Amino acid sequence: EHRANLAAVCAEEMTVNIIKFGGKTSNWIDINLCLEDDICQLRIRDNGVNFNPLEYSYDHEEFDIHGIELVKKISKSMDYIRAIDMNNTIISF
């Protein structure tokens, strides 16, 4: 249940970011949640502008943790690849 809650928070944060900053009027987002052995993976794919969340940093003093920084903090790992003009992010818990 704990990992499901983490996955829900991460899915919401990443999806909101894609919708706000995807740079297109017709974005699409594909979200999959996979559980294999003891690893829970949230896989997010979108056709927005090229954006690597691993390279993102938010340095604003008003917030301790902000959006993608929150996802990085609560996940076990995060991977990204740009393939076939799509952003592919895999977040593990």
Predicted regions and their residues:
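Glycine-rich/acidic phosphate-handling loop/turn and adjacent ATP-lid/helix
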Residues: 40-68
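Flexible, glycine-/charge-rich segments associated with ATP-binding catalytic modules
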Residues: 72-93
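Short beta-strand-initiation
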Residues: 26-28, 75
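Hydrophobic residues positioned within well-ordered beta-strands of beta-sheet architectures
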Residues: 31, 42, 89-91
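Conserved ATP-binding N-box helix of the HATPase_c
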Residues: 2-26
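Short beta-strand/loop element within the Bergerat-fold HATPase_c
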Residues: 28-38
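Amphipathic alpha-helical interaction surfaces
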Residues: 17-21, 39, 50
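Solvent-exposed beta-strand sheet faces enriched in polar/charged residues
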Residues: 32-34, 43-45, 81
